[in-house]
């Protein structure tokens, strides 16, 4: 297999054959070697061992055999054949795609003549085929040339090796000659003349040598110090005259500041240099001469080196001679500018390898300096990452726009490119007197940092959160120290976020290093991210994490969203990608209530959400179709207080529980069609200044009596203010103590929320409640100053307060009715305890009109206690103490207390009827033993509280019955008890009751008044003496036999022995030996109560008393 050598130069400098030149030059000289001799690998001469005899070109080891870039002839021909085959296929496909020529047709038949086709399509195909053949022919001709040349490759390879070896040796020879000549030139400076030892010894010994030549120089006379001073003063005078008179118009503008002294003039250019010049002649046309030069900026060398001084003296003197002072200033000014640029470059290079390593890229231009800062701000792989750099160069100060500046001169100028854009509207000053590249970079970076933080501050300041001043946003800028520029944003009351820009790296640095901050810092340093959105995300995330942490520590549960995000579109219309949301639920709440916290830069929002509870069998439930039933936005008086109050979540529990209770109460009021107003009010006791829900209810629709049409009239204001006073947790043990079934509560949580609401009702006339104490009941208070009732209502969360409120209002109305009647009642009625659940008062007989002396001598009267229990809102329970005379009428009193205006009449009837019932008890107790011994019966029938019927049944042959009515009547404005006989036998001649009663009716007593057939006693103790007198008269009939029996005994025959006397049965007589009637007395002191027969009637009958 043959091999082909590629032309070129190897790594050791050897020449290589140029293959392309050979392939393109068909007629060139070619040499060939036999195909059996193949060169495969380059073997450098230094790598060959002397003991290796195998050399393909039979050359010594010192000659390097060139084999680099050799290619196998077989491989070359194979590739060429494959390429020719592929191009042939492509040509055939292209010819097939070309359209066929359309032959001419005659009468519909194609012409089949053998005439040559000269159509464009046919010619195009032929040209394509011809080009392909020519190209392939040329390639294969080249391959044939290479094949023929390869037959002579062995001889040519030796020639190439020899040529390269000879060329290398010639290069070495030329290098040695050049080095020798270089050393010879350098030795010229080290050459010393031959020493004159004879002359040296003579001079050292005698001080002079006679054979030394004498040049005949006359030394100038020595000058004394006074002459030297005078000479310098003269020189100063000449300089002053020349600069003032001759060269006044020739002095450059920047050389106006100069001083003269010590025989020289010093021109001072502030911030650049000062140069000392002098004159050598008093001719004003002669030039100035250079003496010294000093830099006037820092840092700069303290003095000039000898070489620089010599060069500068020659150059400045040359310029002074050619251009004068103007040329001198221009030359030195440009020299200083160049030196300043070099000094700034030196400082930049030191910074780039020092504290600012990997942050600066310093590049020296023609007469300028380019410094790129923040090179590591963006990742190296970031495409099209913006760059920032500065260019410090010399500004020509050429006038622009035809305006000529005053004394224009070149100066150092700085161009700033920020994020690939040149900043032209900002002039960055350079302190040319004190050069500091670090200070320049800090100034530029400070401005860049200011621009970044200002844009962020502007973007955040326009957010509603900061427009409404809910949080603090502070921007602090410093150009001298960019690291002190920072943007501070309040996250919570105690936490703030500080954003800085690293002055060296240009990356954002965020503090404090809490959990979301590293991610925020990474996002801020990512190209393409909006810093305002990132900072907003940090604030919302940090604040939400703080809320979740505090909420969990106070018994709040944070769960997954129970609804789909689409359901929140109607609630949260201003959602952003940086928002944060959390669903809170308090332990003890029902599962359909949640608090949704939505934090955003547009403002924080808190929503109370009530979800639907679909049936488990419904399709919506199986599909997870829980929807939002009610949503109420929680309004806070101060939104900033959300994060500031440590008791925020306890206040939130208070507020949301109140809202849930309010929602239930509003639905109840709506269902009952009671007018109301929902108006939130601020409760000062809450630290967050939360607007608590308050409901104002129209009282006249709850209590119809307040409409003014009732008998009581309007006694209270027509509104009740209902608000939540407290929220408490009720444990399961308290539920058990209440007697509730534990198994019925198995689905509830162990801790339940109890709402304590406060209802305020203001009375119109507070003097009518003066008998009340400030603490009416354990949950009712009355303010005597404002005349306001404060009711405490308790219920579980989610239950309505309206039923309890209506019940309490009705109780207050009954209490008002009773207290009004107490104020109008006789003086015998006194209140002892007045609460909303229980009223205790005492009563006694009506006071008699006696003098004060007699009243003081009378013993105190017995007072009887009455308890009115209002615990049951539907009824009033009346309780009398033991042995109270009114016990026999307790049922009627109970009915009276629960009747309309009954509580108003009760205090009137009790002292008015006390004497009557006490007399009846006394008479009943006196007849108790008589009834046991069958001597007669005494019965009381209480038809009404002011009407009683008493009946006497005496034994005898015929029934003897006396029936009397005791009725309260009013005559001439005075109350009295009228006692009269109501049976059918008062006019019989043999009526013994009329005989004994006549004595009573006709008796003149100061305690009652006789009315011939009846008597009338006052409501005080007089009626009691009247009834006892009647009873005493009736009991006289028990000692003598009846009048009828005496007459019968006179006509009755003597009874024979063995006969039984015939005794007439009396239906109601006590002498009947038959079974005892139910009305017989029982045991104990309450026998009178058990003996009475009460007829159920209405509590108030038709009587003559007018109580209005």
UniProtKB/Swiss-Prot annotation:
Signal peptide: none annotated. The keyword Zinc does not apply. It comes from the Eukaryota. One of its GO terms (biological process) is regulation of transcription by RNA polymerase II. InterPro entries: Med14_N, Mediator_Med14. Residues 1-30, 35-54, 1048-1108 are annotated as: Disordered. It is found in: Nucleus. Keywords: Activator, Nucleus, Transcription, Transcription regulation. One of its GO terms (molecular function) is transcription coregulator activity. Residues 35-52 have a biased composition (Polar residues). It holds the Pfam family Med14. Residues 1048-1080 have a biased composition (Low complexity). GO terms for cellular component: core mediator complex; mediator complex. The keyword Iron does not apply. Component of the Mediator complex, a coactivator involved in the regulated transcription of nearly all RNA polymerase II-dependent genes. Mediator functions as a bridge to convey information from gene-specific regulatory proteins to the basal RNA polymerase II transcription machinery. Mediator is recruited to promoters by direct interactions with regulatory proteins and serves as a scaffold for the assembly of a functional preinitiation complex with RNA polymerase II and the general transcription factors. Belongs to the Mediator complex subunit 14 family. Component of the Mediator complex. This is Mediator of RNA polymerase II transcription subunit 14. It comes from Pyricularia oryzae (strain 70-15 / ATCC MYA-4617 / FGSC 8958).
């Amino acid at each position: 297999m043959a091999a082909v050598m590629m032309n070129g130069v190897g790594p050791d400098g050897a020449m290589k054959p140029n293959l392309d030149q050979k392939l393109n030059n068909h007629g060139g000289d070619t040499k060939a070697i036999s195909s059996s001799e193949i060169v495969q690998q380059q073997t450098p001469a230094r790598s060959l061992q002397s003991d290796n005899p195998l050399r393909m070109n039979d050359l010594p080891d010192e000659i390097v055999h060139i084999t680099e870039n050799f290619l196998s002839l077989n491989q070359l021909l194979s590739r060429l054949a494959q390429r020719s085959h592929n191009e042939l296929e492509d040509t055939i496909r292209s010819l097939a795609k070309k359209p066929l020529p359309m032959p001419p047709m005659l009468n519909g038949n194609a012409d089949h003549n053998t005439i040559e086709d000269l159509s464009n399509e046919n010619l195009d195909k032929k040209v394509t085929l011809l080009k392909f053949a020519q190209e392939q022919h040329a390639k294969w001709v080249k391959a044939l040339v290479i094949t023929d040349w390869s037959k002579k490759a062995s001889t040519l390879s030796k020639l190439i090796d020899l040529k390269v070896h000879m060329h290398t040796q010639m290069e070495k020879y030329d290098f040695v000659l050049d080095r020798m000549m270089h050393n010879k030139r350098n030795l010229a400076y080290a050459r010393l003349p031959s020493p004159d030892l004879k002359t040296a010894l003579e001079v050292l010994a005698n001080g002079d040598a006679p054979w030394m030549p004498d040049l005949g120089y006359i030394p100038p006379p020595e000058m004394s110090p006074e002459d030297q001073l005078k000479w310098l003063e003269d020189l100063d005078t000449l300089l002053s005259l020349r600069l003032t008179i001759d060269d006044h118009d020739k002095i450059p503008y920047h050389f106006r500041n100069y001083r003269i002294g010590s025989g020289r003039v010093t021109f001072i250019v502030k911030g650049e240099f000062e140069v000392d010049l002098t004159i050598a002649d008093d001719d004003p046309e002669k030039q100035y001469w250079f003496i010294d030069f000093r830099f006037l900026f820092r840092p700069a060398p303290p003095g000039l080196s000898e070489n620089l001084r010599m060069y500068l003296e020659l150059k400045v003197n040359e310029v002074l001679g050619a251009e004068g002072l103007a040329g001198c200033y221009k030359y030195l000014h440009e020299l200083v500018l160049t030196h300043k640029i070099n000094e700034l470059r030196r400082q930049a290079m030191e910074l780039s390898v020092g504290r600012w390593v990997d942050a600066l890229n310093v590049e020296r231009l023609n007469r300028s300096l380019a410094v790129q800062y923040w090179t590591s701000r963006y990742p190296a792989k970031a495409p099209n990452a913006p760059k920032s750099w500065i260019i410090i160069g010399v500004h020509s100060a050429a006038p622009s726009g035809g305006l000529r500046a005053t004394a224009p001169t070149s100066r150092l100028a700085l161009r700033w490119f920020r994020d690939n854009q040149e900043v032209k509207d900002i002039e960055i000053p350079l302190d040319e007197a004190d050069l500091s590249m670090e200070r320049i970079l800090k100034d530029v970076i400070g401005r860049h940092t200011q621009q970044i933080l200002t844009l962020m501050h502007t973007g955040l300041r326009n957010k509603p959160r900061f427009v409404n001043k809910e949080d603090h946003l502070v921007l602090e800028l410093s150009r001298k120290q960019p690291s002190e520029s920072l943007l501070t944003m309040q996250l919570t009351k105690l936490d703030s976020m500080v954003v800085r820009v690293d002055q060296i790296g240009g990356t954002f640095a965020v503090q404090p290093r809490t959990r979301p901050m590293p991610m925020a810092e990474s996002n801020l340093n990512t190209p393409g991210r909006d810093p305002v959105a990132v900072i907003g995300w940090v604030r919302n995330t940090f604040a939400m994490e703080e809320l979740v942490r505090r909420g969990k520590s106070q018994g709040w549960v944070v769960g997954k969203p129970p609804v789909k995000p689409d359901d929140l579109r109607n609630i949260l219309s201003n959602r952003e990608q940086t928002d944060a949301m959390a669903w809170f639920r308090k332990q003890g709440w029902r599962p359909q209530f949640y608090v949704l916290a939505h934090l955003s830069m547009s403002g924080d929002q808190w929503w109370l959400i009530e979800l639907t509870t679909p049936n488990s069998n419904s399709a919506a439930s199986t599909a997870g179709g829980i929807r939002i039933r009610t949503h109420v936005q929680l309004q806070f008086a101060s939104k900033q207080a959300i994060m500031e109050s440590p008791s925020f979540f306890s206040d939130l529990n208070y507020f949301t529980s109140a809202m849930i209770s309010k929602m239930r109460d509003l639905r109840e009021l709506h269902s009952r069609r009671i007018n109301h107003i929902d108006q939130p009010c601020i409760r000062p006791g809450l630290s967050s200044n939360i607007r608590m829900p308050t409901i104002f209810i129209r009282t006249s629709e709850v209590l119809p009596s307040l409409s003014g049409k009732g008998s009581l009239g309007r006694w209270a204001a027509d509104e009740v203010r209902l608000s939540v006073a407290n929220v408490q947790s009720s444990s399961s043990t308290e539920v058990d103590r209440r007697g509730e079934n534990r198994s019925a509560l198995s689905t509830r949580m162990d801790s339940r929320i109890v709402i304590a609401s406060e209802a305020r009702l203001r009375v119109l006339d507070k003097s009518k409640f003066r008998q009340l104490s400030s603490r009416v009941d354990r949950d009712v208070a009355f303010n005597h100053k404002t005349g306001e009732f404060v009711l405490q209502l308790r219920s579980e969360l989610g239950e309505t307060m309206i039923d309890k409120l209506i019940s309490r209002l009705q109780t207050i109305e009954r209490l008002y009715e009773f207290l009004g009647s107490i104020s109008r009642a006789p003086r015998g009625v006194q209140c002892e305890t007045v609460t909303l659940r229980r009223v205790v008062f005492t009563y006694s007989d009506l006071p008699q009109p006696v003098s004060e002396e007699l009243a003081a001598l009378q013993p105190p009267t017995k007072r009887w206690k009455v308890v009115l229990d209002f615990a049951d809102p539907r009824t009033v329970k009346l309780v009398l103490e033991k042995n109270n005379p009114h016990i026999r009428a307790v049922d009627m009193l109970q009915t009276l207390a629960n009747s309309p205006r009954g509580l108003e009449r009760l205090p009137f009837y009790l002292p008015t009827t006390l004497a009557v019932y006490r007399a009846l008890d006394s008479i009943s107790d006196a007849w108790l033993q008589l009834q046991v011994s069958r001597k007669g019966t005494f019965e009381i029938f209480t038809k009404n509280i002011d009407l009683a019927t008493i009946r006497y049944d005496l034994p005898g042959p015929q029934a003897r019955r006396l029936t009397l009515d005791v009725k309260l009547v009013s005559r001439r404005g005075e109350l009295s008890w009228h006692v009269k006989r109501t049976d059918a036998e008062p006019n019989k001649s043999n009526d013994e009751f009329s005989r004994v009663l006549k004595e009573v009716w006709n008796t003149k007593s100061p305690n009652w008044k006789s009315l011939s057939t009846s008597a009338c006693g006052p409501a005080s103790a007089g009626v009691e003496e009247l009834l006892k007198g009647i009873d005493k008269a009736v009991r006289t009939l028990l000692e003598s036999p009846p009048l009828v029996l005496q007459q019968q005994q006179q006509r009755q025959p003597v009874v024979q022995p063995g006969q039984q006397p015939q005794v007439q049965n009396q239906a109601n007589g006590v002498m009947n030996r038959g079974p005892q009637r139910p009305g017989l007395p029982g045991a104990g002191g309450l026998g009178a109560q058990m003996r009475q027969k009460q007829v159920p009637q209405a509590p108030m009958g038709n009587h003559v008393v007018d109580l209005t």
